């Protein structure tokens, strides 16, 4: 356990400290962050609101069917990829706010595809494997064209891009409505939760595309 200012961290060995917005943050994979002053319930409620709004939007567009399909494996992979994704996305917030959250959905598409295709191989792939020729900037096109094998000029790709862009715009609108001070610690945490929601939505869209469905299982007596 150690502190940075008034903040307290409980970490594993080799924890990575990164600086974002001039503040120090710890790798989500290595540490558990304890903040006695932050309204955790607020973040949980906001995350639920974001996910519900995106679920409604995606269902209206036919990308989902009223449920966010998910697996524990895929959700856990976000925890591994999140620190490096955040390091790429945060600098994009000011100029490209929609991109900064939307690319997490494409990452979700890719991870869900890997979970179905060859999970053991995809688990070993570093975050940078999802980069396009221009790195983070064209990650979206690389994932759609090269991983999912969907031609970028196809109706499927265009519909997917339109839906993810709409989700990103919805998320940005919800964040702005909260009137959180920019570049504050709370703003960082809200952004992190927003990216997690976008990742899950992207994964759910791909799981549906691959034919997975949610089924209730009745347990025997």
Say what each PLM segment does.
Residues 1-36:
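N-terminal amphipathic/basic-hydrophobic helices that include classical n-h-c signal peptides
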Residues 22-221:
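Intrinsic-disorder/low-complexity detector
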């Amino acid at each position: 356990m150690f502190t940075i200012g008034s903040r307290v961290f409980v970490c594993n060995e080799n924890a990575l400290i990164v600086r974002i917005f001039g503040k120090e943050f710890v790798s989500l994979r290595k540490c558990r962050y304890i903040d006695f002053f932050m309204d955790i319930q607020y973040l949980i409620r906001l995350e639920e609101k974001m996910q519900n709004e995106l679920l409604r939007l995606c269902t209206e567009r036919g990308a989902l069917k009223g449920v966010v399909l998910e697996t524990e494996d895929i959700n856990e992979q976000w925890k591994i990829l999140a620190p490096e994704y955040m390091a790429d996305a945060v600098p994009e917030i000011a100029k490209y706010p929609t991109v900064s959250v939307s690319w997490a959905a494409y990452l979700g598409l890719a991870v869900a595809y890997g979970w179905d295709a060859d999970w053991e191989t995809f688990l070993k792939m570093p975050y940078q494997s999802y980069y396009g020729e221009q790195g983070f900037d064209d990650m979206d096109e690389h994932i759609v064209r090269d991983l999912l094998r969907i031609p970028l000029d196809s109706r499927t790709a265009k519909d997917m891009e339109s839906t993810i862009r709409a989700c990103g715009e919805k998320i940005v609108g919800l964040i702005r409505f909260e009137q959180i001070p920019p570049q504050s610690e709370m703003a960082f945490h809200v952004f992190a939760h927003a990216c997690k929601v976008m990742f899950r939505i992207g994964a759910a869209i791909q799981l549906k595309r691959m034919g997975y469905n949610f089924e209730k299982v009745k347990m025997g007596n």
